[in-house]
Amino acid sequence: MPPLSITVVFPMFNEEAYVERAVNAARDVLGRTAHDFEIVVVDDASTDGTGPLADRLARADPRVRVVHNPVNLKLGGALRAGYAAATKDLVFYTDADLPIDLAELPRAVRLLEYQQADIVAAYRHDRTSEGWLRTVYTFAYNHLIRILFGLKVRDVNFAFKLFRRSVLHRFPLRSSGSFIDAEFLLRARKHGCPIIQIGLDYFPRTRGLSTLASFGVIAEMLREMAENWKDLR
């Protein structure tokens, strides 16, 4: 496997309870496995202490960078800002609450290189610990994406995407909301990027609130899905 050059992107909105833990965990794993890495924290106009905490971590370590969105751009805008800031060969995105064990990242990199893929998208072995409502919502969303677009990815919105940065040069991303994950995978498929999947253990958040299953987020996802249907199917 070639020397590992990787950017880790953490989109964050009001994640002061997690920001230091997330950065330290990424730095620990990458410090043992990567020859060249950076950690990009996207502060999506947080109203708590996320931004100042991230800035303090960046001042202490030049490998940590912070992108401050002047207004809240939601997940799509935060990820687009983080991806635009990435400079390394590979890009990895996950959530600040670390829904996965970051020690799995080197395995994903090995699979990416061994199978000569462009993207690794992970799926959760078991997500019932989140409760029945989120479980049903995710099941329905994944099947809707499969029916409308024919995308055979088991866990479209799971926050574990590893990919070659060169993929970002092949197409623009336009979504502002949580449809960004589906858009990324669909545009990648349309441009012939090989996608592989791996199963991971899942650790639901214990602090703060997830807004992914809120009515407003779901409505925005459905709107963007409808707008992009002809282009992405």
Question: Where are each of the predicted segments found?
Answer:
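Cell-envelope/extracellular polymer assembly enzymes that use nucleotide-activated donors
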Residues: 5-7, 38, 183
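Acceptor/aglycone-binding surface of glycosyltransferases and processive sugar-polymer synthases
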Residues: 69-85, 90, 102-178, 204-224
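A conserved acidic beta->alpha catalytic loop
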Residues: 43-52, 98
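Conserved donor nucleotide-binding strand/loop of the catalytic core
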Residues: 37-40, 51-85
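Acidic helix N-cap motif at the loop->helix transition within catalytic regions
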Residues: 17-21, 48-57
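N-proximal low-complexity "stem/linker" segments adjacent to membrane-targeting elements
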Residues: 1-28
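Catalytic donor-sugar/metal-binding loop of nucleotide-sugar-dependent glycosyltransferases
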Residues: 152, 173-176, 185-203
